């Protein structure tokens, strides 16, 4: 006692020390069979306190752990031991029942046709068989022939080898029936008649029990001692069997009448009872064994079926309703359940194996004789009978109409008193259904709770926000204040999703205006709310979850469509760029800018024009600033200078008249196609630049000497890349004031005006003037490439128009 108190207040030892104390104490007290080896191990592992085992401190802990281990082993093996014990008891009881009990030559226990679990109610089945409302368990024959003799039928019924027809084995020999004297007729007549109430006690007497031999019964039946059938010992053994194999609900200790044995009579009408039963054997259509013709008959289609097959037919396991049907035969205890629970499990009644009609049941017509067990018909016990048909009435009906009558032409109702349904031999089906429903409800509630907790914790959390999953009882239904009141910017998705997430917060009105610093919000319903409110809340949340999923799928579909549209636009843009690049390459290589003679107008009345346009708009400005090394050879530079001089002199020679303007579209097109990214040789670009410089100086030198009229519709080639004619610019100048004007971004002007001015005839053209026709190939190239090249290459051009040019236009 002191050791156990010390153990309670002492700090818990380590597992190794505790184990060492246990084995050490067991070695000192001699309880362990492995004391020597474990004592050595405990001496090594005890450490600094080897004297505890000597004092016996570890004894109590050893007893506790040993008891705990023993209890654990018993708990694991208890179910197996119980099942084994019940199986042994059933085997023993079966042997005893087959040896001592029978009903009209049949048995009250199964014959081993089915080896599965016998889950039917054996007490109810026994009572129905004794009342002759259900056929007993006949012994089935594997083979049968109508030509068999009596001793062959007896051998087949007892399970012995079938002898030849003309040979009778010694064990099958039977004595002749008793002499039909006056003393012998009376018992047989009494056995075939309804038992008289005043003489019912004499059937249990010793004289009536021992008056007939028992050697010719289907099984070796020993005479029972006097008073055994009515003694408490016999009834207690039957009740013990019922208590071992049935539930508490099936025990009918108060309503079960007394069982009595009729006098043993192995003969019926002078024949052995086996020969009388099996001479007209009938095959069971389910197990294909041959039985006496006194079998059960289905109530619906009047088909024979043995009792061993009948007790195997039962209701299917509880399952969800199929095709929306409701259970018609619910138990009375199930009637008070809520109607809104439409997803409960149901248990359908068993169907007939022949015609598949529900509410399977059978009827039984017993043979015209009585042997074995019957219920006593004491008047004091008659009011306690719970069955509508007693053994007396069944005996009377059996004597009135034997089983060889005409086949029934109509089916019987399942509620008929003579019908035994499968629910009768399994009355616990309602309890099994209730247990299955309760189990399903618990599983559904657990799953709903998990889904609800996960939904509440993740409804308003953003995708990148870390989620805090708390699995505690209170933490499952709560979140921190930061996750409960997130900002609008932290939520991803459409406004509809944000609104739905806000609705699913399920906060109380008092918490809607609270800040995030107030702590945890009450997401779960109050504890005092009813179960109905919780169910409604769960249904509402499930509906919101469905709406949220629908909106999320729609949002995902919309994003996917936008992504596809962006991909298509990008693909089209890439194709356009490829086409433009191909067009540029085609225009550049088809028009040689260096080989075209830049047609220079010889009109001296152009005035002083200062061109500030660059040679190529897309060209980088770094070469003009001296930041790049000049890689052009001196020969190329000299060639470019010579080419520019030849251009100026040739233009002055070809156009001697001052007011004749020669348009060179090929020069415009070829110069427009030049680009620093597409030029194959940098020397060509420098040659064009040198020509531009020479031509600019030429225009400035000739502008002072010529002051004649100028045709506004005639356009000349500007220094290199001015694709708009000066005549169009001068025409725009007339619409403005008299001051100088800088024209920027001339690409915005209509290109048709320049084209018209380039092709219009000169109004005041003198005789002898001739205009050089433009190259048709160059004109076509300009028309094709002007739209895509002009906006990029004319942004940096500016033209300054002097007063001399304006006066010339006015004079014209």
From Swiss-Prot:
Q: List, alphabetically, the InterPro entries matched.
A: Sip5/DA2
The UniProt keyword set, sorted, is: Cytoplasm
Quick check: keyword Cytoplasm in the entry? Answer: yes
Annotated compartments: Cytoplasm
Disordered: region residues: 1-97, 159-187, 200-232, 244-266, 317-340, 384-412, 507-533, 554-718, 732-778
Keyword Cytoplasm annotated: yes
Task: Give the Low complexity compositional bias ranges.
Answer: 14-33, 200-211, 387-401, 632-651, 689-701, 748-758
Cite the record's Basic and acidic residues compositional bias ranges: 34-44, 61-97, 172-187, 317-326, 554-582, 732-747
Q: Which residues form a coiled coil?
A: none
Q: What is its main location?
A: cytoplasm
CC per GO annotation: cytoplasm
Disulfide-bonded cysteines = none
* Composition bias type Polar residues, residue spans: 244-255
Q: Which family does it belong to?
A: Belongs to the SIP5 family.
Any idea what job this protein has?
May negatively regulate the snf1 kinase.
Kindly give the PANTHER family that the UniProt entry links to this protein: PROTEIN SIP5
Quote the protein name from its UniProt record.
Protein sip5
This chain's source organism reads Aspergillus fumigatus (strain ATCC MYA-4609 / CBS 101355 / FGSC A1100 / Af293)
What gene is it encoded by? Answer: sip5
């Amino acid at each position: 006692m002191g050791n156990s108190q010390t153990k309670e207040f002492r700090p818990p030892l380590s597992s190794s020390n505790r184990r060492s104390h246990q084995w050490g104490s067991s070695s000192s007290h001699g309880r362990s069979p492995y004391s020597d080896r474990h004592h050595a191990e405990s001496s090594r592992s005890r450490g600094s306190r080897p004297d505890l085992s000597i004092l016996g401190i570890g004894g109590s802990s050893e007893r506790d752990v040993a008891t705990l281990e023993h209890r654990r082993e018993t708990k694991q093996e208890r179910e197996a031991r119980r099942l084994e014990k019940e199986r042994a008891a059933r085997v023993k009881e079966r042997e005893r029942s087959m040896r001592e009990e029978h009903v009209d030559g049949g048995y009250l226990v199964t014959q081993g046709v089915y080896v599965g679990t016998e889950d039917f109610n054996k007490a109810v089945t026994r009572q129905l068989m004794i009342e002759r409302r259900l056929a007993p368990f006949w012994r089935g024959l594997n083979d049968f022939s109508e030509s068999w003799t009596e001793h062959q039928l007896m051998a087949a019924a007892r399970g012995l080898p079938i002898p030849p027809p003309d040979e009778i084995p010694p064990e099958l020999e039977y004595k002749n029936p008793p002499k039909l004297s006056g003393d012998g007729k009376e018992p047989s007549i009494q056995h075939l008649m309804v038992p008289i109430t005043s003489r019912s006690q004499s059937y249990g007497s010793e004289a009536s029990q021992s008056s007939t031999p028992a050697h010719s019964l289907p099984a070796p039946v020993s005479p029972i001692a006097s008073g055994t059938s009515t003694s408490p010992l016999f009834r207690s053994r039957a009740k013990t069997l019922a208590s071992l194999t049935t539930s508490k609900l099936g025990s009918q200790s108060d309503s079960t009448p007394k069982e009595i044995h009729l006098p043993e009579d192995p003969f019926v009408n002078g024949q052995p009872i086996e020969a009388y039963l099996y001479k007209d054997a009938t095959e069971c259509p389910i197990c294909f064994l041959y039985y006496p013709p006194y079998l059960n008959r289905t109530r619906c289609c009047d088909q024979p079926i043995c009792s061993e097959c009948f007790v195997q037919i039962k209701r299917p396991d509880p399952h969800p309703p199929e095709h929306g049907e409701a259970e018609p035969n619910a138990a009375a205890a199930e009637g008070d359940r809520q109607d809104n629970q439409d997803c409960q499990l149901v248990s359908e009644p068993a169907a007939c194996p022949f015609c598949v009609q529900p509410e399977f049941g059978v009827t039984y017509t017993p043979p015209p004789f009585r042997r074995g067990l019957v219920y006593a018909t004491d008047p004091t016990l008659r009011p306690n009978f719970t069955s509508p048909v007693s053994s007396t009435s069944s005996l009377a009906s059996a004597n009135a109409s034997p089983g060889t009558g005409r086949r029934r032409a109509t089916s019987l109702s399942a509620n008929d008193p003579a019908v035994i349904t499968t629910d009768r031999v399994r009355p616990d089906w309602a309890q099994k259904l209730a247990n299955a429903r309760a189990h399903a409800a618990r599983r559904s509630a657990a799953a709903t709770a998990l889904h609800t907790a996960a939904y509440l914790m993740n409804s308003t959390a953003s995708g990148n926000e870390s989620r805090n999953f708390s699995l505690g009882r209170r933490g499952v239904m709560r979140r921190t204040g930061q996750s409960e009141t997130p900002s609008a910017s932290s939520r991803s998705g459409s406004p509809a999703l944000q609104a739905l997430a806000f609705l699913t917060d399920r906060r109380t009105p008092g918490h809607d205006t609270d800040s995030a610093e107030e702590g945890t919000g009450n997401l779960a319903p109050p504890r005092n709310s009813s179960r109905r409110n919780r169910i409604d809340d769960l249904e509402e949340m499930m509906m919101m979850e469905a709406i949220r999923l629908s909106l999320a799928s729609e949002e995902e579909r919309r994003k996917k469509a936008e992504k596809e549209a962006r991909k298509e636009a990008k693909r089209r843009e890439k194709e356009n760029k490829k086409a433009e690049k191909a067009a540029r390459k085609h225009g550049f290589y088809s028009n040689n800018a260096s080989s075209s003679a830049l047609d220079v107008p010889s009109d001296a009345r152009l005035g002083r024009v200062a061109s500030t346009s660059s040679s190529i708009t897309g060209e980088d400005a770094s070469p003009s600033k001296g930041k790049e090394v000049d890689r052009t050879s001196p020969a190329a530079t000299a060639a470019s200078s010579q080419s520019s001089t030849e251009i100026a002199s040739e233009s002055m020679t070809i156009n001697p008249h001052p007011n004749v303007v020669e348009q060179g579209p090929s020069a415009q097109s070829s110069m427009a196609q030049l680009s620093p990214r597409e030029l194959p040789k940098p020397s060509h670009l420098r040659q064009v630049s040198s020509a531009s410089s020479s031509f600019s100086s030429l225009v400035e030198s000739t502008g002072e000497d010529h002051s004649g009229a100028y045709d506004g519709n005639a356009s000349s080639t500007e220094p290199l890349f001015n694709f708009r004619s000066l005549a169009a610019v001068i025409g725009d100048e007339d619409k403005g004031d008299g001051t100088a004007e800088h024209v920027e971004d001339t690409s915005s002007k209509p290109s048709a005006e320049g084209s018209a001015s380039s092709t219009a005839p000169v109004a005041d053209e003198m005789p002898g003037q001739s205009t050089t026709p433009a190259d048709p190939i160059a004109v076509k190239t300009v028309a094709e490439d002007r739209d895509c090249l002009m906006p990029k290459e004319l942004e940096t051009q500016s033209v300054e128009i002097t007063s001399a040019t304006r006066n010339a236009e006015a004079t014209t």
